[in-house]
């Protein structure tokens, strides 16, 4: 009887442990999935404002370059590469959320013309799959197939990102025409300086919220500082909280001004945006051009032959 009770107790404990572990996994996975890949998805219906500015610049304040390469023209219902390059110095290390230093991550948003979309896996060639690697692209919104996002992903491996794009066919999509279209891109390297809710991250400079004397600097156990400033005008104490990461620039007893930097700016990344143009080419126009070029070549050949024939006739007449 005692053995049966013991086995029953062990079974209950194992079941409880599995349930707790499963709950922890689900909660952890949910928090991670909600945080990635693009913060802008949480607060903006469209990543490109009416002014042309891509909203990622609201959180990534430093301006850095980005480059996009696409074919000059594509045929309908064709898979092509849109290559986005996010250059940066691979030796750089960024401040992580815990205040430690680590490698930079990168991310990108690609805004395609109407009708263009991510190519289905069965249409992607093995060579293109090799260039894509293990990247997983997603739509900015389920209903917006023309806007693609990726990241954050390790910058050491993916500073060049290849998007596989499928061009539309005007024969099946009446909203698409054979025209020249713009493509917009935004790319960032490193963490942002501001979270979507307006809070500062630890990857930015912190300024004094009052003018006065630094009366106390308390180094917190888990990193960061509490800086007490005695206001010069009324003697009240103001406490500025500095998270782990930025390096302190002031010391106790120092006189500081309002908005004076209390820390260095640890940010080594930034955001950039660019654009390119692509022509959706009508196959019949291409065929017409080829026919025209072929006719020109044939005309030139016949002209040369005719000229040689004429020269032979002249030569024979002279000999006669």
UniProtKB/Swiss-Prot annotation:
This is Cytochrome f. The gene is petA. Heme binds at residues 36, 56, 59-60. InterPro entries: Cyt-f_TM, Cyt_f, Cyt_f_lg_dom, Cyt_f_lg_dom_sf, Rudment_hybrid_motif. The chain crosses the membrane at residues 286-306. Residues 1-35 form the signal peptide. Component of the cytochrome b6-f complex, which mediates electron transfer between photosystem II (PSII) and photosystem I (PSI), cyclic electron flow around PSI, and state transitions. It is found in: Plastid, Chloroplast thylakoid membrane. Keywords: Chloroplast, Electron transport, Heme, Iron, Membrane, Metal-binding, Photosynthesis, Plastid, Signal, Thylakoid, Transmembrane, Transmembrane helix, Transport.
